[in-house]
A protein has these predicted regions:
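ER/secretory pathway lumenal C-terminal domains and tails of membrane proteins involved
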Residues: 1-242
Length: 242
């Protein structure tokens, strides 16, 4: 627990608006070699009719301050820019989330994003023949036996694990017996957007490499390959049509 507000103070916050004028907000940073200043600072504008802050904005600031960098803080990619309260210079995209960093950062963490989007977790099939009972029973059996989880091809990183595994499961997306409503289909486009964003970031890096006098041919080939593989994986996991 790191939120230090009492229930009474929370009730007071939710029952009224806090008048606010555009100003700089500063949060201290501890032991970050990438932040020589020892703090992050951003401009916080009024979020309610140009005069006040909404309760959710005050809570975000409170969470950041009270967490004191002991736990990671994330924003979903579906959170609008306005609701990120001006923190964009300290947020990097890692897939379906932005992570708040204790220093200025690039908009996309290509290494983390590539790891999340390109790793295969769960059955490699596009779930056209996914069987719920078989999948969960096999994963449970593997965990109970204490064995490392492997799929039928004897490959790692394919099911439940006691340890963190990067990546997303695209389970049942190709199963025509499963109904997806319009809202779900719209939300699934966030996956495609993540792949496109990653590929575009690699493309920008590729163009920047071309402008250098001593361009590394190996680096160019590597970036081009990543662009192609990223878009190919998007087509495999989130195709335009089943």
């Amino acid at each position: 627990q790191f939120i230090t507000l009492s229930d009474r103070k929370i009730d007071q916050l939710t029952s009224s608006l806090q008048r606010w004028e555009k100003q700089k907000v500063r949060v201290p940073v501890y032991d970050d070699p990438k932040n020589k200043k020892g703090y992050i600072e951003w401009e916080m504008r009024p979020t309610y009719q140009g005069q006040a802050l909404r309760v959710q904005d005050m809570m975000i600031m409170r969470i950041i301050n009270d967490a004191a960098w002991r736990v990671p803080i994330y924003f979903a990619v579906t959170v609008s820019q306005q609701n990120r309260i001006g923190l964009d210079n300290f947020l990097d995209m890692q897939g379906l989330t932005f992570q708040l960093k204790s220093h200025r950062t690039s908009p996309v963490d290509t290494e983390k994003m590539y790891e999340n989007l390109m790793m295969d977790v769960g059955p490699k099939e596009w779930s056209t023949n996914f069987n719920h009972d078989d999948f969960y029973s096999s994963m449970t059996e593997s965990l109970q036996s204490g064995n490392s989880i492997k799929n039928v091809e004897n490959e790692y990183n394919q099911g439940w694990s006691k340890n963190y595994q990067p990546g997303y499961m695209f389970r049942n997306l190709g199963n025509e017996s499963i109904y997806f409503n319009k809202q779900t289909k719209r939300l699934l486009q966030n996956y495609r957007s993540a792949y496109v964003q990653l590929a575009f970031t690699y493309y920008v890096d590729y163009q920047n490499q071309l402008k250098k006098k001593n361009t590394s041919e190996k680096k160019l080939v590597e970036l081009k390959d990543k662009i192609i593989r990223t878009l190919h994986k998007m087509g495999e996991k989130i195709p335009q049509k089943p």
